[in-house]
């Protein structure tokens, strides 16, 4: 039996996470598991609010984990990620899929994670700890808390190139 718990804050939700728990934000990955009766989890935790702000300062770009691909496309400060966000799903998926959730997407769905890795991004967890994207991706299968943001160092959009390569059907 699947149970769902709604928490007031992201920090509270982080404390509720366990081995058989999945966090629900956009739902594009978790709901697939629900629909196909994935036996690896029996509990869903969600928070009433998720950080969605996309903010640039002199040192780089901070993207809240709850920001959707559509939010990225609408943010002038996130221009460097526009080509990537445009390639993720169709409009319905881009309106739901979150930056934080895409970090957990298995091949071939984790397009954003690839670009963030190339841009030397860092992942911020609930509680404030950060780690390099490479370290995060290497251990993402181990439960370690909730992602709250992705932080990119300052980069020039005209110097970054990204291409999606996939098999044709």
Annotate each language-model stretch with its function.
Residues 1-169:
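C-terminal structural segment of proteins
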């Amino acid at each position: 039996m699947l149970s769902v718990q709604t928490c007031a804050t992201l920090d509270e939700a982080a404390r509720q996470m366990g081995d058989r728990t999945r966090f629900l934000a956009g739902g594009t990955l978790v709901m697939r598991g629900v629909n196909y009766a994935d036996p690896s989890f029996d509990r869903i935790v969600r928070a009433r609010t998720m950080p969605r702000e996309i903010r640039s300062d002199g040192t780089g770009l901070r993207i809240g984990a709850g920001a959707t691909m559509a939010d990225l496309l609408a943010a002038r400060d996130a221009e460097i990620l526009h080509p990537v966000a445009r390639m993720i799903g169709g409009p319905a998926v881009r309106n739901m899929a979150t930056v934080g959730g895409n970090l957990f997407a298995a091949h071939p769905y984790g397009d954003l994670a690839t670009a963030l890795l190339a841009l030397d991004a860092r992942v911020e967890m609930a509680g404030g700890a950060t780690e390099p994207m490479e370290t995060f991706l290497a251990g993402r299968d181990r439960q370690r808390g909730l992602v709250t943001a992705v932080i990119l160092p300052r980069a020039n959009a005209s110097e970054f190139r990204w291409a999606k390569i996939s098999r044709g059907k």
